[in-house]
């Protein structure tokens, strides 16, 4: 009887895990780039750390309640991984915050990371291109369903934004579905 109870608990845990996985897979984002390139250059993590302002992105479920002020802050942890703090302002003025952890996957370039905001579940975070002075960055992942354009300045100006769009197009991304972030 005891082994039957253990089997039942095991099946319940497996079913719950399958349900959580299915929930993440239900919403399929359109592919904005069918052949995501490898990151263009190495990343100096010390220079990449700090606050980044989201300039534009592809639509994602986890940012839909964000109406303005989207930032990502990265800081180094003692174990070599990276703290990730994503913040945004909702329409009611409240702040939404997500705390995560990133680990470097490719130590030769530091451009490929895995990021988790939910326990053992990690997603790809590829720094596809960045300015030599680290004033901007273009981030994606291998499926082509996610894209972020980031800047060190909250309002980098129209010329800088158009340059980011041009660079994303050069990486093969369809920039028509971009959502431009208001940084009030």
Question: Language-model segments: which ranges?
Answer:
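A beta-rich soluble binding module of mature secreted/lumenal proteins
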Residues: 2-184
């Amino acid at each position: 009887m005891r082994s039957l109870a253990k089997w039942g608990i095991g099946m319940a845990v497996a079913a719950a895990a399958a349900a959580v996985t299915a929930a993440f897979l239900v919403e399929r984002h359109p592919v904005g780039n069918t052949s995501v390139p490898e990151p263009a250059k190495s990343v100096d993590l010390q220079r990449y750390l700090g606050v980044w302002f989201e300039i534009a992105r592809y639509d994602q479920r986890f940012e839909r309640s964000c109406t303005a002020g989207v930032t990502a802050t990265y800081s180094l942890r003692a174990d070599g991984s990276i703290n990730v703090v994503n913040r945004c302002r909702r329409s009611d003025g409240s702040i939404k915050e997500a705390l995560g952890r990133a680990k470097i996957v490719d130590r030769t370039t530091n451009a490929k990371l895995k990021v988790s905001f939910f326990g053992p579940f990690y997603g790809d975070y590829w720094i596809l291109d960045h300015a030599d002075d680290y004033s901007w960055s273009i981030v994606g992942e291998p499926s082509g369903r996610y894209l972020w354009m980031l800047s060190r300045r909250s309002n980098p100006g129209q010329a800088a934004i158009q340059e980011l769009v041009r660079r994303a197009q050069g990486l093969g991304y369809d920039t028509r579905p971009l959502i431009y972030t208001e940084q009030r």
